[in-house]
Amino acid sequence: MNRFLTLLFIFFAICTDISAQEAEMEQHLFDTMRDGDKAAVVAIHIGAEDADAKQNIEKFNAMLRKAYPTIDFREAWTSRILIQQVHSNGGGNIPTTDELFSQLNKDGYTHLLIQSSNIVNSTDMQILRYEVDAAKETFKQIRLGEPLLTDETDYEEVLKATAAAYGSEKEANVLMCEGTHGSENAQYALLDYILKVQDYKSWFVATSGGYPSLSSLVKQLKKQKVKKVHLIPFLFTAGSKATSAIAHEWAQQLQRAGYKVTTELHNLSDVDAIIDIFENHLRHAEMFHRYSPKELKMMTR
């Protein structure tokens, strides 16, 4: 297993480095603007199911507004279910990504700088990449920042910030991550591996419905003869309702396994250093033009 994780780390680090760095050139987004051009900074979220989740989203949005105070700000959600919930409750109309792009085009915008609140390179993030690539025919420049966990430095900085904010010295700290599918699991396995490489003693990663799983977590806890567990939501836009539901389910299973459980009430959105990493990714997207698959294909001819 150790050999497998080592190879996984190397493979993921290499793939990330190639996709995020080598296939790009330095070209400041706003330097490409000409008379008559219009720019917007765009925040993309899955959505919010309660007031707390909306506050978490607003912290992210406030970061974008502060970082680019003279640029128009826009927001879109990717979950139609959450959009409909807000609309049904009288919260107004929030556009999907496609709807927002269409409206921005009608309003004469030519340059878009986009950052999502995705933690990992999830299916939702992959769909957003596809939508951005499709919109490149519509706008003069459209740039997309990377998710929170992109290269190995991100992993290390996120773990350092999370440990400083929520770590417990008297209990085993468990990062509660959202369930993933297929190859997405590798990103949380990598997170768990870096915890061990960086010598974060008594720190663990588990996902709801993915890997590392709760059952694999319990095996690790037994090996280290852990008695107390501190659950830490490794979430960003989730509100108290969703976080509490996940934590309650996990706590029950761990208690049945014989552990005393405490739960952190906050998540990653309350950590300033985490917000800063998102901003750094957006700044990078502003400064560098990333080649599309079509552009890369043309370059190899």
Tell where the protein language model's regions lie, with residue ranges.
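Sec-dependent N-terminal signal peptides
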Residues: 4-14
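Sec/Tat signal peptide C-region and signal peptidase I cleavage site
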Residues: 16-20
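Active-site-proximal alpha-helix that buttresses catalytic centers in soluble enzyme cores
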Residues: 21-301
